[in-house]
Amino acid sequence: MPNKALITGFWSKVKVDEVGAEALGRLLVVYPWTQRFFEHFGDLSTADAVLGNAKVKAHGKKVLDSFSNGVQHLDDLKGTFAQLSELHCDKLHVDPENFRLLGNVLVVVLARHFGKEFTPELQAEFQKVVAGVASALAHRYH
């Protein structure tokens, strides 16, 4: 179980709109096969196009708003993400591996934004959280 106080204290400093936009943008650039779920977002042909895309930024914020909800409910991630798991499995048919990839990209973005403040101890705690969220989102697939 992650250290709740450490996670929630740090998370309160995160600018969800900026970090969410960058995390989703990086996911789409670093793992371009994930773009197939976002073809309706328009031009995703280059890194600059992806990172400057208003729909990517807006959806990144939406994703991180949901993640923020998970941070507030670390004891019940499966329940917190049950509806999103159902949506991504049954309707969108998203490969559950993408949840793990996004979690890892999120950790990279947090490290980039917070530098030395994102200590190895904090990273270890966040790895637990992103793994828990990825597992909760993949729950419907099992």
Curated annotation (Swiss-Prot):
Key words, A-Z: Heme, Iron, Metal-binding, Oxygen transport, Transport
Known tissue expression: Red blood cells.
InterPro entries per record: Globin, Globin-like_sf, Globin/Proto, Hemoglobin_b, Hemoglobin_oxygen_transport
Pfam families assigned: Globin
Globin domain mapped to chain residues: 2-142
Record bears the keyword Metal-binding: yes
GO CC annotations on file: blood microparticle; haptoglobin-hemoglobin complex; hemoglobin complex
Binding-site positions, heme b: H59, H88
Biological-process GO terms, alphabetical: hydrogen peroxide catabolic process
GO terms, molecular function: haptoglobin binding; heme binding; hemoglobin alpha binding; metal ion binding; organic acid binding; oxygen binding; oxygen carrier activity; peroxidase activity
UniProt miscellaneous comment: This type of beta-C chain is found when anemia has been experimentally produced.
Annotated family: Belongs to the globin family.
Subunit relationships: Heterotetramer of two alpha chains and two beta chains.
Function: Involved in oxygen transport from the lung to the various peripheral tissues.
Protein's name according to its UniProt entry: Hemoglobin subunit beta-C
Organism: Ovis aries (Sheep)
Record lineage: Eukaryota, Metazoa, Chordata, Craniata, Vertebrata
